[in-house]
Regions:
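A short secondary-structure junction signal
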Residues: 116-126, 145-146, 165-167
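Short, conserved beta-strand element in jelly-roll/cupin
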Residues: 98-118
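Double-stranded beta-helix
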Residues: 146-181
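Polybasic, positively charged surfaces/segments
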Residues: 72
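Conserved metal-binding segment of the jelly-roll/cupin
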Residues: 127-147
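N-terminal leader/capping segments at the start of a protein or of a new domain
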Residues: 1-68
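Conserved short histidine dyad/triad with adjacent acidic residue
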Residues: 75-100
Length: 181
C-alpha cells in the first residue's frame, strides 16, 4: 500500500502526518505541485528485467506519457536482491539532488521510497506497483530502494539529456528515516 509520511526538519524521527489513502496522498502532494496517480502497468515485469524488456512491455504507456507531457528521455531502474551489490549508482540516487526538468517516476513492479524536500518539510512517499509520481523541475529529492531492493521503475524526463543531478549540499537524507524495503 502506498504511503505518504510528512516530517518537519526539526523532528526528523517523528512524523507530523502519515497517509495511506490514495486520494489523501494525491491531495497533499498536489498542494506542492506534485501529481500522484495510479495507472495499471501493461504486463507484469520481473525485478531485475533489462531496460529493453521493460520498455518493450510498457511501450503503450511510455508513448502516452511522451505525447502528453513532452518527455524526451527515459531510463529504467530494475534491481532485485541478487543484483543489488552490483548497482553502485544506488548511492547516487540516495544523495539529495534536483533535476532541471520535470520528471515522472512510474513504478512497474516492487516498491521504492522517494523523499521530497520542500522548505522545512520532508514528504516521503512509498511508491508501489502502478504508482506514478510527477515531480516538478528543481524539487530536491532522493530515491531509496532499501536494503533488499526489488524494484522496476521507469523515469521519464523533460530534459533531453535525462538524469543529470544537481546535488544539494549538505544533503538532508541522512537525518531522516531510511526505507527498510
Amino acid at each position: 500500500m502506498s504511503r505518504l509520511t510528512v516530517y518537519h526538519q526539526s523532528t526528523p524521527d517523528i512524523p507530523n502526518k502519515v497517509l495511506s489513502h490514495h486520494v489523501d496522498i494525491a491531495a497533499t502532494l498536489a498542494e506542492l505541485g506534485i501529481r500522484f496517480e495510479r495507472a495499471e502497468a501493461s504486463l507484469p515485469v520481473p525485478a531485475g528485467a533489462g531496460q529493453e524488456e521493460v520498455i518493450a512491455t510498457c511501450r503503450g504507456e511510455i508513448d502516452a506519457w511522451m505525447a502528453k507531457g513532452g518527455y524526451l528521455d527515459i531510463d529504467v531502474i530494475s534491481v532485485d536482491e541478487d543484483h543489488a551489490q552490483h548497482m553502485p549508482w544506488q548511492a547516487e540516487l540516495l544523495r539529495e539532488h534536483r533535476l532541471a526538468g520535470e520528471w515522472v517516476l512510474c513504478v512497474v513492479a516492487g516498491r521504492v521510497q522517494i523523499s521530497l524536500h520542500v522548505g522545512d518539510y520532508l514528504y516521503s512517499v512509498l511508491c508501489e506497483r502502478d504508482d506514478r509520481l510527477v515531480v516538478p523541475a528543481g524539487m530536491a529529492h532522493w530515491l531509496d530502494m532499501g536494503e533488499r531492493p526489488r524494484i522496476v521503475a521507469m523515469r521519464l524526463f523533460t530534459d533531453a539529456y535525462g538524469w543529470r543531478p544537481d546535488y544539494v549540499e549538505p544533503s538532508a537524507h541522512e537525518r531522516f528515516p531510511s526505507f527498510e524495503g
